[in-house]
Every structure is written in C-alpha cells, then in structure tokens.
C-alpha cells in the first residue's frame, strides 16, 4: 500500500506511479482518507509530471468502481457523446444536440454530463433549461434509455465520492486528471463513445486508456485549435478504437461535402438560453454552421455506436433524422418522459 506522502515524493521526483499504486491512492482519495492539502499536492504533481496512460486507466477504473451505476440488462449497443470541455470555445451544446439526432437515427444514447465549468453552457444546464429532470434515479435513467433511446446521467448523482476531492480541484485553478476522468466513467457502462478532447495529444492517450478499460468502438476527436468536437474550421484529429486496434487519422468537413468555415463565430453563445435556441434551430431544420457541425458529430456518434457503417453513412442518417422532424420529436419525447416527482440526489454538487 502506498501512502499519500510516498506518492507525493514519487511525483515531485518526476517518477510515475505504477497501476496498483495509483489504484490504491485513488481509492484512498475517493474514500475521504486523504486530507485536502495532500490531494492538492498529488493533483499538482501528476499535472507537472504529466499523467501516463497507466495512471489515467487506474484512476478511471476506481471512479467506475465507486460510481452509482445504471442497471441495464445489456449495455452492448450504448453510445456516449461527451467532451472533456476546457476548450474555451463558447460554442452551443453540440454534443447534446447530437444526442437527439443520433437517437432519432436509431442509436441508444447514454450521455454522461455535468454543469458548465469553462463553457457558456454545460450539458446538464441545457438539459435542465429545456425542462427535463436531471435528478432521475439510476432505474429511471435505464427506463428512459429503453423507452426513448436516451438516458442523461447527471454526473454528481452518480459520483458521490467526488465530494472528497471536488472542492480541492475547483480551488486549484488549473486542469487536473479529473478533467479527463469524467468522460471515461460512464455509469451505464457504454462501450461505444464519441469523446471530444481539448488537445490532440489526448486522442492517442485516451484511446489507449479506453482500450485497456475494455471499450469496443471509440472515436476520440480534437478539432483544429483545440475544439473538443469535430470542427468546421479545418482538420480534426481522430483516434479510433475498433476491433481492439487503434488507428489515427485526420478528417475535414469537405471530406463529407460540408463547407469549411473560417471561424466558429456563428455557433458561439453567451449563455444556456442562447444555446437552447441554437439547438432548437438545428432540430427544426435551419441551415447553417450549427446544423453542419451537428451533422458531423452525430455522424461520428452513429459510426461509433455501430448504427452507421461509415462517417459518410452517418452524415446521411443524421440529415434524414433532422429533415424528417424525428430529431425534434425525439427531444420532445425525452423531455416528456421525465417523472414529475424529483428525487433527492446530490443535484447541487458539481464535479468541477
């Protein structure tokens, strides 16, 4: 067993922690056995040294171990559409909009998200703004997935052990390992994923982490300029995990007949209300940059979820889901499912 002090000494000497050591240390932190000042030192040491694939994998495995899981008989076909955040782009909720389009095209989406930390509007903020209930029990989330094809898991409801580290990570003022752990710890166990990251280096790193964690089909993407989505402004780096193997490549909007934009100004928003307005415009079929970026990201989600055979097929399916009105109806179905009785979970707690 490694003590927090031993871990700190290893990290400040620029030495990595072995998998078993990181597992043990993470369990101590998630159990409330490590004082805040030592948590701060550990997170700082990991950031300065740079977290390894092994360290991230161990930490994610422990977070999954401590999570309150969604009880599903079969999670095999589930796909998560999620981003790390931290890109500072202030775009509308692209992945949340894509959730409705993907579900309308036949995907089973188990989306894991929280409130805004660095963006104009977090996934949970916009889901709440549209009138949905964030505080579903795990059983109700499972029922939502079965009935509507969508389940939204508000992160604090499923990661109560984060209360031991959340105040420290918020106070640090810089990214820590926890910024990338959230997207790796889907409580429904979705084996397929479209994961947006804020730096191209993370594409290869997190695809290897998810490979070790047993994921099946994953696209880890980083748009030009550090956007944690597939972008419209140029190339997007993709690390794809499929059939146990990882391949890396670049894609561009014009590869799929979509116009490359000079900037993302058309899809930037100032708050949750503006984000929901932009989402509704897309779901109602309005042409423009917002629709195009949703088409690209939905296509990737459909491909990752094995609903589409390729990204090009995914574009066609996404376009048809919007133009037929099914994507708009899917959103209404999702919001309408939510039970009126609120459950007293940890709804006010933030993961970060």
Swiss-Prot record:
Catalysed reactions, as listed in the record: N-(5-phospho-beta-D-ribosyl)anthranilate + diphosphate = 5-phospho-alpha-D-ribose 1-diphosphate + anthranilate
Enzyme class per UniProt: transferase
Positions contributing to 5-phospho-alpha-D-ribose 1-diphosphate binding: 83, 86-87, 91, 93-96, 111-119, 123
Molecular-function annotations in GO: anthranilate phosphoribosyltransferase activity; magnesium ion binding
Keywords for the protein's UniProt record, in alphabetical order: Amino-acid biosynthesis, Aromatic amino acid biosynthesis, Glycosyltransferase, Magnesium, Metal-binding, Transferase, Tryptophan biosynthesis
Residue numbers binding Mg(2+) 1: 95, 229
GO cellular component: cytosol
Cofactor(s) of this protein: Mg(2+)
EC number in record: 2.4.2.18
Residues reported in the UniProt entry to bind anthranilate 1: 83
Domain of life: Bacteria
Cofactor note: Binds 2 magnesium ions per monomer.
Biological process per Gene Ontology, one example term: L-tryptophan biosynthetic process
Pathway: Amino-acid biosynthesis; L-tryptophan biosynthesis; L-tryptophan from chorismate: step 2/5
Function of the protein: Catalyzes the transfer of the phosphoribosyl group of 5-phosphorylribose-1-pyrophosphate (PRPP) to anthranilate to yield N-(5'-phosphoribosyl)-anthranilate (PRA).
Similarity-based family: Belongs to the anthranilate phosphoribosyltransferase family.
Subunit structure: Homodimer.
Name of the featured protein: Anthranilate phosphoribosyltransferase
Native species: Neisseria meningitidis serogroup C (strain 053442)
Record gene name: trpD
């Amino acid at each position: 067993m490694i003590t927090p002090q031993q871990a700190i000494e290893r990290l400040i000497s620029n030495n990595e922690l072995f998998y078993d050591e990181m597992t043990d240390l993470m369990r101590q932190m998630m159990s409330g056995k490590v004082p805040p000042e030592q948590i701060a030192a550990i997170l700082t040491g990991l950031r300065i040294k740079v977290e390894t694939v092994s360290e991230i994998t161990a930490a994610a495995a422990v977070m999954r171990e401590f999570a309150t899981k969604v009880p599903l008989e079969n999670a095999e076909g589930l796909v998560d559409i999620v981003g790390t955040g931290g890109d500072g782009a202030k775009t509308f909720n692209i992945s949340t909009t894509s959730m409705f389009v993907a579900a309308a095209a036949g995907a089973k989406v188990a989306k894991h998200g929280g409130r805004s930390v660095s963006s104009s509007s977090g996934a949970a903020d916009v889901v709440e703004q549209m009138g949905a209930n964030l505080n579903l029990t795990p059983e109700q989330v499972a029922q939502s997935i079965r009935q509507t094809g969508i389940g939204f898991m508000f992160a604090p409801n499923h990661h109560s052990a984060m209360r031991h580290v959340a105040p420290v990570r918020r106070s640090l003022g810089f990214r820590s390992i926890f910024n990338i752990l959230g997207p790796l710890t889907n409580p429904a166990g979705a084996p397929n994923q479209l994961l947006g990251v804020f730096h191209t280096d993370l594409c290869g790193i997190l695809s290897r982490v998810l490979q070790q964690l047993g994921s099946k089909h994953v696209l880890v993407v980083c748009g030009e300029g550090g956007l944690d989505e597939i972008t419209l402004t140029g190339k997007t780096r993709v690390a794809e995990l499929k059939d146990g193997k990882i391949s890396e490549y670049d894609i561009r909007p014009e590869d799929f007949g979509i116009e490359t934009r000079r900037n993302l100004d058309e899809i930037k928003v100032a708050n949750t209300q503006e984000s929901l307005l932009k989402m509704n415009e897309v779901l109602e079929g309005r042409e423009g940059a917002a629709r195009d970026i949703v088409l690209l990201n939905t296509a990737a989600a459909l491909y990752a979820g094995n609903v589409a055979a390729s990204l090009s097929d995914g574009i066609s399916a996404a376009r048809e889901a919007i133009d037929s009105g099914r994507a708009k109806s899917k959103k209404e179905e999702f919001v309408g499912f939510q039970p009126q009785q609120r459950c007293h979970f940890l709804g006010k707690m933030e993961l970060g």
